[in-house]
């Protein structure tokens, strides 16, 4: 299988997201290839696909400081990017999705590179890379028709004061971890490589992957760049994508499940039937969850109806990661089994 590598020519989040999507869905379409993609976003908040932007982000501070904000197309939680942060994507044929420990296997060479330069990095938990118990990288996954994408951040020299300033960390997550602040849960790789600048570190990382994977560098032509820029402006930079429709709901509930993440449900009910329903959270979905919520709209708002629908979803794990239908029902109905 041939491997390709690319470092984005821009640090604009909307462009970089559109370029990532293009690599996933259009580049060498129909061919079984591996793509390694590096990019950096300047001064940017990134929320997960299934998160509520208004709840996750301190919007007053974001607007005051003119911080970029966009929603990625994968699940997981919100993060802050600056030029001390390096993002990476690894794209593989969809068949590779079936391997066990997909996150760990896919990012094995990231850990190998860091170990080779003296950083004691390791994979931990459901989707994190850590150094001595502190997180420096969070991973998320997404499936296209033919390919699987695993991508993540790598905190090299990020300003953690901004990380805490712009993100509203969920209290249930903080309580479960027994830690007081965002800063105490994360670490910069630069603490272990004090003599390296971010550009030099990225250069070494790209060189390592190019040599280890025998990767061919991708050279973007003008038509591809224009296509990516058009997609960035029309989709990833749009209000509809980044904020979406909001509404008043009859019922809202949220809970964190160990090993699965936060699940929040907002339901609007009229005359006993679901008019609208939204699921939010940092659960690790790899495909769009809209088909699930569409099945629930118009149904009776009762436990047995929802249990039957959720229980009959064959690819449930692709929609909700390690969340179970029972856990979702617990949140949706607050432990009340309506008859």
Curated annotation (Swiss-Prot):
Q: Which GO terms describe its cellular component?
A: cytoplasm
Q: Tell me which EC number(s) this protein carries.
A: 6.3.1.20
Write the record's keywords in alphabetical order, separated by commas.
ATP-binding, Cytoplasm, Ligase, Nucleotide-binding
Q: Does the keyword Cytoplasm apply?
A: yes
Entry's localization field: Cytoplasm
| Subcellular location, principal | cytoplasm
The reaction(s) this protein catalyses? L-lysyl-[lipoyl-carrier protein] + (R)-lipoate + ATP = N(6)-[(R)-lipoyl]-L-lysyl-[lipoyl-carrier protein] + AMP + diphosphate + H(+)
Which biological process annotations from GO are given for this protein? protein modification process
Keyword Endoplasmic reticulum set for record? no
Sites binding ATP sit at: 72, 77-80, 135
Any one Gene Ontology molecular-function term assigned to this protein's record: lipoate-protein ligase activity
Q: Which domain of life is it from?
A: Bacteria
Pathway note: Protein modification; protein lipoylation via exogenous pathway; protein N(6)-(lipoyl)lysine from lipoate: step 1/2; Protein modification; protein lipoylation via exogenous pathway; protein N(6)-(lipoyl)lysine from lipoate: step 2/2
The top EC class is ligase
Where would I find the BPL/LPL catalytic domain in this sequence? 30-217
Q: Name one Pfam family in it.
A: LplA-B_cat
Q: Where, in this chain's numbering, is (R)-lipoate bound?
A: 135
What more is known? In the transfer reaction, the free carboxyl group of lipoic acid is attached via an amide linkage to the epsilon-amino group of a specific lysine residue of lipoyl domains of lipoate-dependent enzymes.
Q: What does this protein do?
A: Catalyzes both the ATP-dependent activation of exogenously supplied lipoate to lipoyl-AMP and the transfer of the activated lipoyl onto the lipoyl domains of lipoate-dependent enzymes.
The name under which this protein is listed is Probable lipoate-protein ligase A
């Amino acid at each position: 299988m041939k491997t390709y590598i690319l470092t984005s020519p821009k640090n604009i989040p909307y462009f970089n997201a559109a370029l990532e999507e293009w690599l996933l869905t259009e580049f060498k379409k129909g061919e079984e290839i591996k793509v390694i993609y590096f990019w950096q976003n300047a001064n940017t908040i990134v929320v997960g696909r299934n998160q509520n932007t208004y709840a996750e982000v301190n919007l007053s501070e974001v607007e005051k400081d003119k911080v970029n904000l966009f929603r990625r197309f994968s699940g997981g939680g919100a993060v802050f990017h600056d030029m001390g942060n390096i993002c990476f994507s690894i794209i593989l044929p969809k068949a590779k999705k079936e391997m066990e420990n997909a996150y760990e296997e896919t990012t094995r060479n990231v850990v190998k590179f860091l170990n080779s330069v003296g950083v004691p990095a390791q994979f931990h938990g459901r989707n994190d890379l850590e150094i001595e118990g502190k997180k420096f990288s969070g991973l998320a996954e997404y499936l296209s028709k033919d390919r699987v994408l695993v991508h993540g951040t790598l905190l090299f020299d990020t300003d953690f004061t901004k990380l805490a300033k712009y993100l509203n960390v969920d209290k249930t997550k903080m309580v479960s971890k027994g830690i007081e602040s965002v800063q105490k849960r994360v670490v910069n790789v630069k603490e272990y490589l004090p003599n390296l600048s971010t550009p030099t570190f990225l250069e070494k990382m790209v060189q390592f992957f190019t040599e280890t994977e025998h990767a061919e560098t991708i050279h973007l032509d003008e038509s591809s760049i224009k296509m990516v820029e058009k997609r960035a402006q029309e989709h990833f930079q749009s209000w509809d994508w980044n904020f979406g429709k909001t509404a008043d709901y009859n019922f809202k509930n949220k809970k964190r499940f160990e090993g699965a993440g936060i699940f929040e449900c907002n339901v609007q009910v009229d005359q006993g039937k679901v008019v609208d329903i939204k699921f939010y959270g940092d659960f690790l979905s790899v495909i769009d969850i809209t088909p699930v919520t569409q099945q629930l709209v118009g149904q009776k708002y009762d436990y047995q109806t929802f249990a039957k629908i959720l229980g009959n979803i064959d690819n449930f794990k692709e929609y909700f990661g390690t969340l179970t239908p029972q856990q979702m029902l617990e949140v949706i109905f607050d432990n009340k089994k309506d008859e």
